[in-house]
């Protein structure tokens, strides 16, 4: 018989840098998760992605055990890294802050493909281009 799920917690945590301090500790404590166990597992699993924000979905079961799935970094984080900027534009329609190439967009789309709801790489690229435009980035050929 399958374990009964009592809670699902979604967080975005810097890779390899999960600590019991807020915001991670309180969110996990409320769910009844062993915080130290989670932070050790998460940091070990994401040690190779230092500097990235990693979305994680934690499933908590009735017996207080848990399992978690790490996802790919958000498209906005990957775009900012590719364009070498700290943040997007506050007014994306009027102020463009950076440029990204189609090759960079394709690379990001390939990275994100398993988490995107896209049938093929072209559809994924269109999604990433839309995110780039909404951040005030110009997509060039």
From Swiss-Prot:
SUPFAM superfamilies: Ribosomal L11/L12e N-terminal domain (SSF54747), Ribosomal protein L11, C-terminal domain (SSF46906). Signal peptide: none annotated. Keywords: Methylation, Ribonucleoprotein, Ribosomal protein, RNA-binding, rRNA-binding. The keyword Nucleus does not apply. One of its GO terms (molecular function) is structural constituent of ribosome. One of its GO terms (cellular component) is cytosolic large ribosomal subunit. Pfam families: Ribosomal_L11 (PF00298), Ribosomal_L11_N (PF03946). It comes from the Bacteria. One or more lysine residues are methylated. GO terms for biological process: translation. Part of the ribosomal stalk of the 50S ribosomal subunit. Interacts with L10 and the large rRNA to form the base of the stalk. L10 forms an elongated spine to which L12 dimers bind in a sequential fashion forming a multimeric L10(L12)X complex. Forms part of the ribosomal stalk which helps the ribosome interact with GTP-bound translation factors. Belongs to the universal ribosomal protein uL11 family. This is Large ribosomal subunit protein uL11.
């Amino acid at each position: 018989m399958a374990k009964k799920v009592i809670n699902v917690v979604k967080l975005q945590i810097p890779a390899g840098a999960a600590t019991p301090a807020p915001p991670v500790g309180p969110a996990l404590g409320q769910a009844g998760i062993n915080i130290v166990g989670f932070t050790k597992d998460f940091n070990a699993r994401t040690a190779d992605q230092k500097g990235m924000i990693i979305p994680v979905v934690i499933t908590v079961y009735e017996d207080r055990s848990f399992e978690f799935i790490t996802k790919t970094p958000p498209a906005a984080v990957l775009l900012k890294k590719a364009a070498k900027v700290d943040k997007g534009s506050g007014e994306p329609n009027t102020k463009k802050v950076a440029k990204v190439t189609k090759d960079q967009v394709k690379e990001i789309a390939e990275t994100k493909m398993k988490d995107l709801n896209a049938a093929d790489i072209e559809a994924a690229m269109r999604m990433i281009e839309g995110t780039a435009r909404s951040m005030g980035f110009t997509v060039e050929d």
